[in-house]
Every structure is written in C-alpha cells, then in structure tokens.
Amino acid sequence: MAATAVGNDVIDRDLPTAVRLLNSLTEQIVSVTSHVRELIKKVREKAYQTSKGLSFLDLRYHLLLFYLQDITHLISLKTEGESLKDNSAIHRLVTIRTVLEKMRPLDQKLKYQIDKLVRTAVTGSLSENDPLHFRPNPQSLVSKLSESEDSDDDGVGGKTKEQKEPSGGRRYVPPRIAPMHYDGDLTEADRQKERVEKQKRAALRSSVIQELRQQYSDAPEEIRDRRDFQTDRQGREELNRKNYEESMMVRLSTTRDQKLRKRGMMGMTSQLSNITRFSDITALTGGEVQDIGNPKPKKKKIIKKGKKKVFRKRK
C-alpha cells in the first residue's frame, strides 16, 4: 500500500508537467509540418533553386533528420513499455551525435560565408558594413618589373620553372595534430564553471580528503606490514653504480627504463614536500578558484652566440 501511495504521488506531481510538454510538442509538430509542406510545394514549383546547394548543409540536415527519427522511435518504444537494450537505434544515435560534434568546428568556420551567401541571395548585394568592402585591391599587387626584365628572367630561369612545376602537383599531406575538444562556442562563464568542476574533482581525489574519509569512516582500517624488496634492490644497484663511477672515473649511461624507475621513486618522495599544503581543497571550501587550466608560460632561454675560437697552426 505504501509503494502504491508513493507511486500515485509521483504521478500526480509529474502529470501536469507531462501534459504541458505534450501540448507544446503537439503545437510545434503542427507548426513544423505546415512549414515543411509550404517549402515542399515551393520546391516542386521551382520557386527555389536547390541544384547548387552546399553539400555540407545537406549532410548536416540529413543527419539531424535521422537523429530526430531515431529519437521518435525510442520515445514510442518507451511509451509502449518495451526494453531498449541492444537496440540498433541507440547505436545510430551515438554515431550521428559523434559526427555532428566533429562537424561543429567546420560549421563555425563556414558560418560567415554561408550568412554572406544567404544575405546576398535575399537582398542582391552586400551590406555596407561587410568586411569584404575593405579588402585589398588585387590590381595594386601587379609586379612593377618591365617586360624586358621579365623576358630575361624567363630566359635564365626557364629550367628552374620547369623543375618547379612538378612540385606544384604534389599531393598535400595535412600536418598531424593531436585531437582536442572543441570549445569555441563556450562563453567565459561556461569555461569558469568547467574549471571549478575540474578543481572539485581534483580536490576529492586529494590525499587530504582521502585521509579524512578514512579517519571518519566506520569501515575497518586495513594495515599492511610488508617490505619493499624492489626498492631495496634499486637502492643497492644505485649504490653499486655510484661506487663504480667514482672508482673508475667514468660516467655510465642510463637506459630509458632506469630513468623511468628513478622518476617514479622521486615522485613518491616528492609528496613529503606537499604534506602541509591545503590549497588543493579550496574548491570545496568556497575559496578562490585558481586558474589551473591556463598555466603561466615558461620563459624561453635565449642562448647568446659568442665568438668562435680559432686555433692557429704552429709554424
């Protein structure tokens, strides 16, 4: 009886919101349907020229249409009470969403060109404040060389031009750039919010919070008493290496694995210097958020070129 009462309370609380959303959805569907029918009618009457469109926009709108179809299909399945496990529509939605996210930087770059073309098609001319009105004149970039100098250059550098022509048809290889998350359309407030969330997650993983959690937890404490033979072996190897270098007056080269092991040992010992540092939990206490996403750039060392020493031969 208690579960039934709780279920009825949830239904009574969510029912007005669901009815309002369904009514809004119905109105939007009617508006979109009428608008699409008018567009289809004008296209069939050849009022709009669709032969010279942008393939990028065609792909984007087709993906959005497929996305809406799959979402509608999933909503219908949920209303009928069917299971969505291993449904192919979910995999299609993930694929389409990934492609749309990858297209966002291209859409941001093409936005100005698309808006300019649409404005030109509607008004027939560019606006007065269009940046293209202030573009440089290509006619002023014509070479000032005389025809005689041009002919001389053609005669002398004929072979070089012929040699350079095949390089112009070389295939373009784009540079390999590490993939980064696109955040060009985020505002400064959104970036600040992400930085705060990142600091909160880092603070929850800090050693101070872990120790407080273990201190006030009711779970039994696990005590480990063991001897680290690997650390002892590395210490003996380092001592033998040092004695050998001092006795033989040579410097032994270190391999990559030895450098990684030494760096790991230094990382464990360097934590003692931060044992009294509590600034990493300021995000949880409401303190000032540090700008961890934009570290200060390091100054580059400028190497001054000195005079080279010249050794003269003895006579």
From Swiss-Prot:
Keyword tRNA-binding attached: no
Pfam families hit by this protein: Sas10_Utp3
One biological process term in Gene Ontology: ribosomal small subunit biogenesis
Keywords assigned: Cell projection, Centromere, Chromosome, Coiled coil, Cytoplasm, Nucleus, Repressor, Translation regulation
InterPro entries: Sas10/Utp3/C1D
The family this protein is said to belong to: Belongs to the SAS10 family.
Function: Part of the small subunit (SSU) processome, first precursor of the small eukaryotic ribosomal subunit. During the assembly of the SSU processome in the nucleolus, many ribosome biogenesis factors, an RNA chaperone and ribosomal proteins associate with the nascent pre-rRNA and work in concert to generate RNA folding, modifications, rearrangements and cleavage as well as targeted degradation of pre-ribosomal RNA by the RNA exosome. Its dissociation from the complex determines the transition from state pre-A1 to state pre-A1*. May inhibit mRNA translation.
Name of the protein in its database record: Neuroguidin
Organism: Danio rerio (Zebrafish)
Taxonomic classification: Eukaryota, Metazoa, Chordata, Craniata, Vertebrata
UniProt gene name: ngdn
